[in-house]
Amino acid sequence: MARTKSLSRQIRLARATRGMSVAQVAENVGVTPVSIYYWESGRVRPRDRNLSQLCKVLRLPVRETMALTGR
């Protein structure tokens, strides 16, 4: 649970730092805005493929971000 909260916090902070809306991130990742909301709330963890794309879009370190998923 703590990892999920850390991941959701990291996603939300990176998006805000980049000045991107939920809709912009969703479009660039190839998912719905609802998915981004769920990831940011910690309700759902992104699948590996989506997390990899999210890292590219938000310029997050892939290895460290993947570690937050517990995978």
Give the predicted meaning of each segment.
Residues 19-38:
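Short alpha-helical DNA-recognition segment
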Residues 12, 37-38, 66:
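Key DNA-contacting residues within the recognition helix of helix-turn-helix
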Residues 30, 49-65:
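DNA major-groove recognition helix of helix-turn-helix/homeodomain DNA-binding modules
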Residues 9, 19-20, 46-49:
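Residue-level signal for the short linker/turn that defines the boundary of a DNA-recognition helix
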Residues 1-5, 23, 61, 71:
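N-terminal flexible/basic segments that precede or flank functional cores
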Residues 1-17:
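A short, Lys/Arg-rich alpha-helix, primarily the initiator
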